[in-house]
Amino acid sequence: YTLSLHDALPISFIGAGRLKKALTQMKPGDYIFMEFGHNDQKQKGPGKGAYYSFMTSLKTFIDEARARGAYPVLVTPTQRRSFDENGKIRDTHEDYPEAMRWLAAKENVPLIDLNEMTRTLYEAMGVEPSKKAFVHYPAGTYPGQNRVLADNTHFNPYGAYQISKCIIEGIKKAGLPISNYLRSDYSGYNPAHPDALDSFKWNDSPFTEIEKPDGN
């Protein structure tokens, strides 16, 4: 199950007791997937940075999970929908994705490079069509929504489904034992060839809210 929290940093996740809560319910053979790096770059000052408090906190996650016989998995942050003039994704996470790759190699932890997979995904979709994977809706799409929604970080159901497929493909390519439980008809996923939007069906909940989540 998920204990994720919007706008969280590894160090704040630990400080809020959420890691401790997860550890109390963790059993040998469980998996802990850690995807951070979106909000960490806002942290400035002594001891902050990708190769300082960020990496130290992630090392705590890894050590605590392994001490309980669980499998830690590092997941680099999804790209933001930020294109340059040539239709290529701009890197907006500074050196945080690279720090996670370095830590994964050093600690021999499986890595799902969602940062690179989503670069491929968004560029394959294109500048305008990629809006269909995000919370981009004209005013009046939902009850009480009086303004345009243009969020280039958070996904709508179609986008979230493509990201989920990236994670599943990452699990398979990393050779994690949990991949043995994938459906027998799973044929893989290539982010360079995302599912057609009209092939995705989703029934909206009757309950909606239009507040943008924290984080960017």
PLM segments and residue spans:
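Short, small-residue-biased leader/transition segments that mark boundaries at the very start
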Residues: 1-9
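Alpha-helical cap/lid subdomain in secreted, periplasmic
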Residues: 17-183, 205, 212-216
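A short, charged, Gly/Pro-tolerant segment at domain boundaries
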Residues: 184-202
